[in-house]
Amino acid sequence: MNRTRILVPLVAAAAALGVVAPAAADASPSCSTDWGSRPKAAHPTEPGDDLVSDVRAGRHACFDRVVVDVAEVSGFDAWSVRYVPAVRQEGSGAVVPLRGGADLEVALGARGYDDEGHATYSPARPREAVDVRGYTTLRQVAWLGSSEGRSGIGIGTRARLPFRVTVLPGGSTHRERLVVDVAHRWQG
């Protein structure tokens, strides 16, 4: 009887402190986004013959993603991605305001038009090239146009956050993808 009187309060106290029941597993994913926010580039100033064919976005657990499809003509290898005070329209240099706390400029050594001058990528609403409503980090994706073998995309982000850039080869399709991942937050 004495043993029961002692065990019942002891078990109740242990349960209240979380000693008996294991803590619930952390449901948040493990996000390794230590990419930094410094510029990333490969041959950034060279114009190219490759053709921009599409721009799209996606959401992931730890980052938002923008993908640029490039039809490879001569080996797509000229691009740069960096935070800038303001993005500018290709050709005219006019400032293009973006929503969000920071502007990422994506400069491509690829054209948005073919040899006959026909657009290979021409969104109906260039300032809203991709619908990113409801995304955690992305606030706006704008097509900045194409001029003299170069094209530009502006990405408005919630804040200056880490990002990474990957070029995925197209293989036999000859359609490479420039992938820009922008983290949801800095890792502490």
Please report, for each region that a protein language model flagged, where it lies by residue:
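Secretory targeting and sorting signals
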Residues: 1-27
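Short linear recognition/processing motifs and adjacent strand/loop elements at protein termini
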Residues: 26-188
